[in-house]
Amino acid sequence: MKIVELGHAVLYVRDLERSRHFYGDVLGLPQITPTASGAHGPGAAAFSGGRTHHELLLIEVGPSAASPPPGRRTGLYHLGFKIGTTDDELRDAIRELQDAGVTITGASDHTVTHSLYIEDPDGNELELYIDVQPEAWREDPTLVMAPTKPLHI
């Protein structure tokens, strides 16, 4: 067997409508299915940027569900979403996030990406990034492990 690509992510969320609004309206990820009600199981919503049938599925688990544990631990660290190809698009994203009341928790120059970090309504960390000089990391994949620097845009 050989994995050929990462297909999709599924997140459990406390409040489907709140998360649907965040991923769909704030971040602009197109919702591709109607929001399913919880009448015959958990509520759910699927999203896709068009690369595949869906890149993100949200499943509602209710308000009493536990938050992701803080700090270093095993499990998912964050999801990364490519938002464009230029620092201008990253600057636009900063303005849009601030206008929507989203806190930017970090910003890094990873040599291969310029990245912003935020949290979704359930505390899942997200990386919003642009590729930097894709020809460089294609020629030298070790650049992915380059030291992280502060982002200055």
Residue ranges, per PLM feature:
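Vicinal oxygen chelate
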Residues: 14-17, 74, 79-125, 130-136, ...
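Short beta-strand/turn micro-motifs at beta-sheet edges
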Residues: 64-70
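Histidine-centered active-site/metal-ligand motif
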Residues: 8, 53-54, 78, 110
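Short, charged/polar surface micro-motifs in flexible loops or helix N-caps
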Residues: 51-55, 63, 84-88
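Short, basic, helix/turn surface patches
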Residues: 61-63, 131-141
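Short, flexible turn/loop "capping" segments at secondary-structure junctions
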Residues: 1-3, 71-74
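Core segments of cupin and vicinal oxygen chelate
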Residues: 12-60
